[in-house]
């Protein structure tokens, strides 16, 4: 079994689940017992300013209008912060230059500091044992390597197209039901 974490999964047109239409998923865990990732390019109808206000947290002025992202349909009330703040104490390394924090104690300093790049996701995408491998074999997902720049540095609304083009795939050549034409 190829380890897909960390890596990026790109949803192909034939994946029928609307939760994942043109989604880019950062894989955080992939093992015999299942897989977990965060959709990093699907905005939620919520800003970081609204989130901070709801949690009674301070926030840097430049962050207030930043989008919150729908990380996936599982546990949508649970928050995950992807960031590049090397000074953050409560963090897990995802890949070089990219960290994951999951506590409110970690969120406060990340919101008030205007410097680290971050992406806040609500919920996550999860797969049972061998489920993701079956979906990949059916042509529902395309895998590529992940970088901190791909996760934090690209415009989320263009990430699916940008990543495909970076792989040498023309999105216009993708055909429903067959993956790449």
From Swiss-Prot:
GO cellular component, one term: cytosol
A Pfam family per the record: DUF179
InterPro entries: AlgH-like
Organism domain of life: Bacteria
Alphabetized Gene3D superfamilies for the sequence: VC0467-like
Family: Belongs to the UPF0301 (AlgH) family.
Protein name, UniProt field: UPF0301 protein MXAN_2022
Record organism: Myxococcus xanthus (strain DK1622)
